[in-house]
Amino acid sequence: MGRLFDNSAAKDLKALLPVTLTFADLNGVEKTAPLPRKLAVDGMPDGDDPRVSDLGYWSPDGDLVIYYGDVGYWRGISRIGEVDGDIPAVLRNTGEFSATVESA
């Protein structure tokens, strides 16, 4: 479970739902999955410093990201939502895994 924020990238992601994505671990702090297309980032900040359990969009590569560690500020990160669910369940997936992102 989770929620999307009210911004252009989140609205564009919602238009893609439902979508099944393949996530992989990156640097022991985030799970990333390429989206079928890049999202709109109109009016979004140039970068952000996501928190643990944030849902993000990495605009340089068009990836959806679940943060479970501190990555610090990076240009190209947009916070688009937050995960209310079980982050430890995400961590148990050490290799690639598929998940369907859908609207409640």
Residue map of PLM features:
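Short, surface-exposed binding/anchoring microloops in extracellular/periplasmic proteins
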Residues: M1-A15
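A structural detector for beta-sheet-dominated domains
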Residues: F5, A24, T100-E102
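Solvent-exposed coil/turn segments that connect beta secondary-structure elements
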Residues: F5-N7, P18, D61, G69-V71, ...
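A generic structural signal for short, solvent-exposed coil/turn residues
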Residues: L13-A15, W58, G72, L91-N93
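Mature extracytoplasmic domains of secretory-pathway proteins
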Residues: A15-G62
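Beta-strand-rich cores of mature extracytoplasmic or soluble domains
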Residues: S59-V83
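Well-ordered alpha/beta subsegment
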Residues: I80-A104
